[in-house]
C-alpha cells in the first residue's frame, strides 16, 4: 500500500462522513 493509496482512502472516508453529516443536517 502506497502513501497515495492511504491518502485516497482517508479522503474517501472523510467525504463519506461529511456527506452523511450534511444529509442529517437537512
Swiss-Prot record:
EC number: 1.11.1.7
Keyword set, alphabetical order: Calcium, Heme, Hydrogen peroxide, Iron, Metal-binding, Oxidoreductase, Peroxidase, Secreted
Main location: secreted
Cofactor(s) essential for the protein: heme b; Ca(2+)
Catalyses which reaction(s): 2 a phenolic donor + H2O2 = 2 a phenolic radical donor + 2 H2O
Cofactor binding note of this UniProt entry: Binds 1 heme b (iron(II)-protoporphyrin IX) group per subunit.
Protein's cellular compartments: Secreted
Sites where the protein binds Ca(2+): 15
GO terms, molecular function: lactoperoxidase activity; metal ion binding
One GO CC annotation: extracellular region
One record GO biological process: hydrogen peroxide catabolic process
Entry function: Removal of H(2)O(2), oxidation of toxic reductants, biosynthesis and degradation of lignin, suberization, auxin catabolism, response to environmental stresses such as wounding, pathogen attack and oxidative stress. These functions might be dependent on each isozyme/isoform in each plant tissue.
UniProt similarity note: Belongs to the peroxidase family. Classical plant (class III) peroxidase subfamily.
The protein's name in its UniProt record: Peroxidase 1
Amino acid at each position: 500500500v502506497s502513501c497515495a493509496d492511504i491518502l485516497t482512502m482517508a479522503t474517501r472516508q472523510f467525504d463519506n462522513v461529511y456527506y452523511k453529516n450534511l444529509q442529517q443536517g437537512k
